[in-house]
Every structure is written in structure tokens, then in C-alpha cells.
């Protein structure tokens, strides 16, 4: 499934995205808010791209946003924890340092959320972030997600720490 916005092509990951994926997965700002392991080499980044493209179990769907002018990856967005019974899912994203401040995150989140409602039949998409991650709060609000509350100590951060978590939600009619 390929999605388009004014400035982006949002498509499934491909192994050729590995160099950008490697930079993304090792970026200090991404690592600060994502309790995932570091990416030690390009082969691991390539495998990450391959696994992101496998949507066969129906629990997630991942895309890479690319600049249509260069064809280079600028970000990653995933719809995950998809519950087909309750028709809800969660969305998360990351943006390469060189692409920050250009609306990439907002466009990715909005496009994938619309797809989740229109093509996947979901009735709710949630976006969660650590409260100190102000940039993610701005992205959520700009993409039409309402701030619904704060869950105490609910967000794991690297190093075994915990942060309070903002819960944002978006419904098809929002």
C-alpha cells in the first residue's frame, strides 16, 4: 500500500532503505524516546526493513516516507497493536534528523491514520508519548489527535527508566 501527501511518498520499507534506517535507528533523539536496541550495522538495518515490510500477521503495518524528489527515506511510521475485534490500533513514528521541522511527522501520522480508518476499518487510533517529548505532543495535536489524559509511569525509556505518558486519540469523525 502506497500513500501520498503533498510532500511525501509513504510506502512499505525496502532493503535499499537500510542506510537511512541505520542512521534513524542510531539517532540520539530517536534513541532517547524509543526503548529499542541500537542498530549495530547495515545488515541489521536491512533486516529491520525486511521485517517492517511483512504485514502478514495483521498486527501491524509499517511504511517509510520518502522524498519524491530524491527517493531517499526521511522517516518511518507504523500502525501497530492492531486489535481487529475492538477496531483500534496505535501509531508511532520517527523522522531522520535532516528532515525534522518540515512537517514530515504530521504528514505521515495523518496519512496512515486516514488509511487506518478508510481502508482498514479501525474506529480509533492512539498515539502515546513520554510527557517530556514535547515535539511528539505537537505532532499528535497537529495531526488531529486529542490529548485524552496522562498515564503515570507508563512509558518505558532506554536504560530502564519510566516516564509519564500522554495518551492521544483520534476517531474517524475528528
Predicted regions and their residues:
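Short loop/turn motifs at secondary-structure junctions and domain boundaries
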Residues: 53-59
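A short hydrophobic/aromatic micro-motif that marks alpha-helical segments and, especially, helix-coil
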Residues: 13, 32, 41-43, 56, ...
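Short, P/G- and charge-enriched loop/turn segments at secondary-structure junctions
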Residues: 50-53, 154-156
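Conserved GNAT-fold acetyl-CoA-binding loop/helix
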Residues: 29-51, 63
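Acyl-donor (CoA/ACP) binding surface of acyl/acetyltransferases
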Residues: 1-28, 62-174
